[in-house]
């Protein structure tokens, strides 16, 4: 009620959203702008963290095997790639899907390398009913 007596706020000219050639209007930052802001944030975080040197009782796990280092690097690379791919998605994944994504690195290699298409005979299905419906119409 009291806002009737106040001076109306000065209206700023709203920025015109970019329109693509196909007629869609882009809202928010583009992927390039998001990457630039993400890089800026990570460099700010890295710059603000104090350096830790020569701590004897550290609780961090050290990886000495080069193969394990390679797998750890690939896992980190895959998770950053997945995060980058999902950054443009306008919704979030369900919590149980996110939990599965987090535990996939804990699975043994023989389970991860299993190819489900090797044993397709167990997925056999008879389409005679569907074919008869299509042929009758």
UniProtKB/Swiss-Prot annotation:
Domain UMA: from-to ranges: 86-134
Organism from which the protein derives: Homo sapiens
Protein name: UBAP1-MVB12-associated (UMA)-domain containing protein 1
Coiled-coil boundaries: none
Gene giving rise to this polypeptide: UMAD1
InterPro entries, alphabetized: UBAP1-MVB12_assoc_domain, UMA
UniProt region (Disordered), positions on chain: 1-72
Signal peptide residues on this chain, from the entry's feature table: none
Biased composition (Basic and acidic residues): 32-44
Ranges of compositional bias, category Polar residues: 50-63
